[in-house]
Curated annotation (Swiss-Prot):
CDD domains named among the record's database cross-references: VSV_P-protein-C_like (cd21033)
Record keywords: Chaperone, Host cytoplasm, Phosphoprotein, Viral RNA replication, Virion
Function: Nonenzymatic cofactor regulating the function and conformation of the RNA polymerase and part of the transcription and replication complex. Binds the viral ribonucleocapsid and positions the L polymerase on the template. Acts as a chaperone for newly synthesized free N protein, so-called N(0). Plays a role in virion assembly.
Compositionally biased residues, Acidic residues: 58-70
Subcellular location: Virion; Host cytoplasm
InterPro entries: P-protein-C_vesiculovirus (IPR048220), Phosphoprotein_C_viral (IPR043036), Phosphoprotein_central (IPR037263)
Full protein name: Phosphoprotein
């Protein structure tokens, strides 16, 4: 207490007391504006490196915004979506499916057979929507069917639809031009001795009936074909025997099935 009393008495007689108080107030005002960290530095406290989590927080604050902008175009999977084993989810398609118009053929017509003073005409309507290559294939198919009529009677053929197309069959096909093997007899007949069977076009061949009540069937190539060209066009050839040519004519005229029932062909 004595010391404190002495200090008070001394301050009363201190001539620069007001100046000292003002300096103290100014120092206190400056200290109030500074952070505790800065005060520690002024007081000589040793500066330590800032903890790593402060640095990480600062880095994340400065880099988070550009990183979000850079990843805006990337696909972010939904964390709440149900995960399926083996399934890797990727970005969804960013385009919409194009609308495709489907048009069903409505103007197609059944084949029509027309007759006039010039003859007969069969009209086949081309299917709609075919490409150039498909149209060519369709026309080639029709042409092949027409050409095949030279080697068999289409009216006697069977028509079968399959998964790959159409199958046309006939049990007994007329002899092929390049595969005919003449039957050689011990005593060759006149028809086998000639070089061209059409030279016997006016010669008749007789087939005996299976029943006594019927008359024998006598027929010639001239009666079955109008010309040698017609005979060749349906599969005939000069190397055929006379009987083979006659049987070909009966098939061509659609008389073969009826004749083989009544006569020994």
């Amino acid at each position: 207490m004595d010391n404190l009393t002495k200090v008070r008495e001394y301050l009363k007689s201190y001539s620069r007391l007001d100046q000292a108080v003002g300096e103290i107030d100014e120092i206190e005002a400056q200290r109030a504006e500074k952070s505790n960290y800065e005060l520690f530095q002024e007081d000589g406290v040793e500066e330590h490196t800032r903890p790593s989590y402060f640095q990480a927080a600062d880095d994340s604050d400065t880099e988070s915004e550009p990183e979000i902008e850079d990843n805006q175009g990337l696909y972010v999977p939904d964390p709440e979506a149900e995960q399926v084993e083996g399934f890797i989810q990727g970005p969804l398609d960013d385009y919409a499916d194009d609308d495709v118009d489907v048009v069903f053929t409505s103007d197609w017509k059944q084949p029509e057979l027309e007759s006039d003073e010039h003859g007969k005409t069969l009209r086949l309507t081309l299917p709609e929507g075919l490409s150039g290559e498909q149209k060519s294939q369709w026309l080639s198919t029709i042409k092949a069917v027409v050409q095949s009529a030279k080697h068999w009677n289409l009216a006697e053929c069977t028509f079968e639809a399959s998964g790959e197309g159409v199958i046309i069959k006939k049990r007994q096909i007329t002899p092929d031009v390049y595969k005919v093997t003449p039957v050689m007899n011990t005593h060759p007949s006149q028809s086998e001795a000639v070089s061209d069977v059409w030279s016997l076009s006016k010669t008749s061949m007789t087939f005996q009936p299976k029943k006594a009540s019927l008359q024998p069937l006598t027929v010639s190539l001239d009666e079955l074909f109008s010309s040698r060209g017609e005979f060749i066009s349906v599969g005939g050839n000069g190397r055929m025997s006379h009987k083979e040519a006659i049987l070909l004519g009966l098939r061509y005229k659609k008389l073969y099935n009826q004749a083989r029932v009544k006569y020994s062909l």
